[in-house]
Amino acid sequence: MSKVLERFLNYVSFHTTSEDDQEPVPSTDRQWILAKALEQELKALGATNVRMSEHCYVYATIPATTTKKVPALGFVAHMDTAPALTAENVKPRVVKNYDGGDIVLNEALGIVMSPKQFPRLKNNEGQDLVVTDGTTLLGGDDKAGIAEIMTMAEYLLTHPEIEHGTIQIGFTPDEEVGRGVDFFDVEGFGADFAYTVDGSTLGEIEYENFNAAGVKLKIQGTSIHPGYAKGKMKNAVLLGMEFQQMLPVSENPAYTEGYEGFYHLDKIEGTVDSATLYYIIRDHDKVKFEEKKKLFSKVCEFLNEKYGQDTFSAEIKDNYYNMKEKVEPHMHLVDRAKEAMEALEITPTVVPIRGGTDGARLSFMGLPCPNLCTGGENYHGRYEYVSVNAMEKVVEILIKIIELYAK
């Protein structure tokens, strides 16, 4: 078994799901367990300045082996998994030499992953894939990134003959709930530039991401006995449905791709008396992003005129912005990644992230930080999988980037 696979299978055994609407960082105590294990592993590998912060951030240094003036590079991945589906008791399975057909994830439950539903699955024919048993997500997002960074670190620490500058490693909590760098110590991290290893398909390089906002839409209804409700009842749940119908139908995650933004209704809580709808708003274009937020407010105003003031109230909070403007002055980061992939006969593909990464916010905190692939697909659900062959290649990509910066 390859080292990166062995590490990955170990890391996904840790239940590290983060939670929304929790004040502390980390949002769940279970993230500490993996953090402590990673801290101990880094120490055992011989990394220096290994430390864990009071907010569950793990940092480490691989000292430079060259006297040349070389930028200090950082590599960052996150420890938590998305709350979209449970990651407790993950039972990974390695499908050897995938034949290109359907993969039965759980025969008893009739859960099958098919290239008819997931066409990109076919691209992995002949590779070894790590899949779920259909009852949990896998955790490749971002434990594949952690395994790749850790395996890269082990290689550099056991091959001191390789010339490289100072390498900084950072593992973060709570990325999936938008708080991954709330307490990240950029100055103490000590990197001039960094990469997150939190992408998807092998060969992808990302330095554009969504502008993102979260919305908490509160609706105050009027509860009356339904037998005597004529002209009196305001059903908050139905009002929420009316609000949703006033948003553009085509600007929905299921109908968008590439640079197209969307409104996404993530969760509904409510009764006749009151309801709360939780939305996320996304767009790569800053102007369109602002327009989407304005439309949200306009719909609230319109419905308040119809149903009475203070029936609808929206709390809109920006989460992160498109890092493109912060990375473009340092395009050597993208160019080096391309060069590294080409040297390894991997075709680089620059694509926009239809999401966000810790790197997006780090870029606005003074640490330009594009995103690199991990080899995983179908994140945040039971059909998630990771290519073992791709993980091994990503380790090589990281090492090659480091070597290129030392030349």
Curated annotation (Swiss-Prot):
Protein's cellular compartments: Cytoplasm
Chain sites annotated for binding Zn(2+) 2: D141, E176, H380
Entry GO CC: cytosol
S-S bridge residues: none
Gene Ontology MF term list: metallopeptidase activity; tripeptide aminopeptidase activity; zinc ion binding
InterPro entries with a match to the protein in the record: ArgE/DapE_CS (IPR001261), Bact_exopeptidase_dim_dom (IPR036264), Peptidase_M20 (IPR002933), Peptidase_M20_dimer (IPR011650), Peptidase_M20B (IPR010161)
Entries under Pfam families matching the protein: M20_dimer, Peptidase_M20
GO biological process, one term: proteolysis
Cofactor or coenzyme needed: Zn(2+)
Known role: Cleaves the N-terminal amino acid of tripeptides.
Identification of the protein by name: Peptidase T
Source organism phylogeny: Bacteria, Bacillati, Bacillota, Clostridia, Lachnospirales
Gene (name only): pepT
